[in-house]
Amino acid sequence: MDKTQPHPLFKLATELGPLLVFFFVNAKFNLFAATGAFMVAIVAAMIASYVVTRHIPIMAIVTGVIVLVFGTLTLVLHDETFIKVKPTIIYGLFAAILGGGLLFGRSFIAVMFDQMFNLTPQGWRILTLRWALFFAGMAVLNEIVWRTQSTDFWVNFKVFGVTPITMIFAIAQMPLTKRYHLEPVSLEASEADAGDVRKG
């Protein structure tokens, strides 16, 4: 099925919208109300993404499932630890997937980024390693913040800290993607070879 490319503002809204809902509901009520609202917003964002583009990015699916699982545990057990450790699980999982993929000669970052660009095998290797280390670092950082700071501080960090950090890191990878950019011979070849680090 063909994928419709969404408007950048729509993509931004589906990614940041749930986080803003989480922040404002927590500020108005409490973390448990914010968790419930966050779960609803995540599902709404995925539905909107599918309606508009007929496609849901794999990262959004994985994140959504983990949010629903840990959000449910938070509400049922009335224990905010689960929603706080959720980012650690997500970052750790992404780091493990990327690192494990490299061991088998694959760069799953191509799938995670929805094949936004085409790189040489060396480019995929470097980019994958960088993102694996980034996700591992973010997992550690989340653990430090939620274990040593207040709930409100953690929420602010999650909404206004993580997003800028991720954007800055992603922008910092642009020289790498330009240096190792590869023009595909065909769309089929591009999709077949995307993320294959065994060549070259």
UniProtKB/Swiss-Prot annotation:
Task: Kindly give the membrane topology term recorded for this protein.
Answer: Multi-pass membrane protein
Q: Which stretches are transmembrane? A: 7-27, 32-52, 56-76, 93-113, 126-146, 153-173
Q: Which Pfam families match?
A: IspA
Q: Which domain of life is it from?
A: Bacteria
- Do the record's keywords include Cell membrane? yes
Q: Which InterPro entries match?
A: YciB
Q: Give the protein's biological function.
A: Plays a role in cell envelope biogenesis, maintenance of cell envelope integrity and membrane homeostasis.
For this chain, the family text in UniProt reads: Belongs to the YciB family.
Q: Kindly provide the name given to this protein in its UniProt entry.
A: Inner membrane-spanning protein YciB
- Tell me which species this is from: Bradyrhizobium diazoefficiens (strain JCM 10833 / BCRC 13528 / IAM 13628 / NBRC 14792 / USDA 110)
Gene symbol? yciB
